[in-house]
Amino acid sequence: IRFLKWEYINFDDCIINIPAEELKNNKPLDVPLANQAIDILKAMQAITGDKEYVFVTSRGKDTPLSENTTTKAIQRLINPVTGKPFGSGYMTSHGFRHTASTMLNELGYHSDIIELQLAHTNKDRIRATYNKAQWMEKRINMMQSWADYLDGLKNQGNVTPINKKVI
């Protein structure tokens, strides 16, 4: 997401179209977005809409945020249990992908749909050769449900803290 370019976002269809050359697996990816994500991106347009990248450095350059910048921002978030910043060792920006995968599996979504949304390649070569399903409607529903679930946690304050470090 740090390298998300405005040209990839299709606001009309609520989707991000990532070209093959931007991904490790060299395959294009269409990423459906929840309404909440679209709202955030529309708000970002007022800030960085004139830049190539959606999330840029604060130095006024058209340079995407560094991984360090996003990780440091996460580390400065306040732990609801201790009332102090999380600090290092608890979460990274990439860790949100792990969390989403785990929680979506726990919520009962099919792992194939989750893996496709995360742009993971099917390691079973025969299955990958024959199965070209994109499950777009299911992914749209999953992402909207995920965003609604997160909103519910945020709005109800019903967040169970996890006291283990992410390894």
Residue ranges and their predicted role:
Residues 7-15, 88-90, 107-131, 152-158:
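Short, polar N-cap/turn motifs at the start of nucleic acid-interacting alpha helices
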Residues 31, 43-54, 59-62, 68-116, ...:
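Short, basic (Lys/Arg/His-rich) helix/loop patches that form interaction surfaces
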Residues 35-39, 43, 47-51, 56-62, ...:
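C-terminal secondary-structure termini that scaffold catalytic or DNA-interacting sites
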